[in-house]
């Protein structure tokens, strides 16, 4: 049986959405939920200063939490419309930042997207932003565990 897909979106698919994807998958596997996360970037061309496949801040937090990484760690990937159609749940990490990009590029999918308010590094320190993402990821996992236990 194919897992249900949650899709995390951010601008560059380098920091916030990647952390959310990896953290969600780690927790979902532990609880055998039948859900899997993936992530994509809405505008990879807007990202600047990226070194390597994933943010060092995301890596440090994942390491501190004992979350293993798939090897090799993939590089950021752009969003295409088919992913928005096939995902069962979609989360954009910051409404103020991502709503304009979605309106411009994928307006037909707006009604399916849940918006969070997690700022990028220019507005929030990594400890704050990544803690917000962790809390955001844990809540639906707990709901899914509760549902599957019934």
Describe the function of each predicted region.
Residues 96-150:
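Phosphate-binding/catalytic loops
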Residues 12-14, 95-98:
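Short glycine-rich anion-binding loops that position phosphate/pyrophosphate groups of nucleotides
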Residues 78-83, 102-104:
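Short, flexible, glycine/charge-rich loop motifs used to bind or transfer phosphoryl groups or to couple energy/partner
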Residues 87:
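An anion/phosphate-binding loop that grips the pyrophosphate of nucleotide cofactors and donors
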């Amino acid at each position: 049986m194919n897992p249900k897909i949650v899709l995390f979106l951010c601008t560059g698919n380098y920091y916030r959405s990647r952390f959310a994807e990896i953290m969600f998958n780690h927790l979902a596997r532990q609880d055998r939920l039948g859900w899997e996360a993936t992530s994509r970037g809405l505008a990879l061309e807007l990202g600047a200063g990226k070194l390597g496949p994933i943010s060092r801040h995301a890596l440090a937090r994942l390491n501190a939490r004992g979350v293993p990484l798939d090897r090799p760690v993939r590089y950021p990937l752009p969003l295409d419309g088919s992913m928005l159609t096939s995902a069962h749940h979609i989360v954009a990490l910051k409404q103020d930042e991502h709503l304009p990009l979605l309106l411009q590029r994928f307006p037909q999918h707006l009604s399916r997207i849940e918006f969070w308010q997690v700022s990028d590094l220019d507005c929030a320190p990594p400890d704050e932003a990544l803690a917000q993402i962790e809390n955001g990821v844990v809540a639906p996992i707990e709901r899914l565990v509760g549902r599957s236990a019934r």
